[in-house]
Amino acid sequence: LVKMQVLLLSLIMIVGIAIQLNNAFYQIEIGHYLFDLFAIHLIGFIIWAFLALFVQSIFNNTYLSLFLLILLALGISQFPSLGIENYLVRFNESPDSSFYLNYSDMNGYGHSLLPFFLYRFYWLLFGIFIYFFTLLIWQRELTNSVFERLTVAKNRYRGKLSFTLMISLICFLSFGFYI
């Protein structure tokens, strides 16, 4: 999934450069393209990919999983209207990214990169946790219900996978308390 996201972001960069050249703007900032697409946006896409793998492993129905992911993506934007203002509970969100990540030639992103990357790292830790949890419940044999998958996951919970799952959960919670 990550390779596909990198490929699509590279395509966006190539098309953006082509549009700039077509409009006779020859001051192309490759570094800015690379940083914006691969350092800022790719992290969020990877976190969503972890969640997509998790939801797909829970439900057998592909369309139901896709619907739930779309519903979650649309629902997160409505959290402030429900009174949920804290970014620690709003999945893959960082503090007011429309304000914080405005780029200017004078000072770049300014003071806004540190809080943005802190929240991205926080949600990346959660993504790593759900990735390892997904490995526990991944359907390797024929199971019909979520309960059966959780039973299989309970039997698989040992060794390096359980250690990594616990470490990622502890890191996620610790970093959440730090922020």
Indicate residue ranges for each PLM-predicted region.
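Internal/C-terminal transmembrane anchor helices
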Residues: 151-179
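Bulky hydrophobic/aromatic packing residues
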Residues: 1-2, 128
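Secretory targeting signals
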Residues: 2-60, 100, 115
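Terminal transmembrane helical anchor/hairpin motif
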Residues: 25, 63-137, 141-152, 179
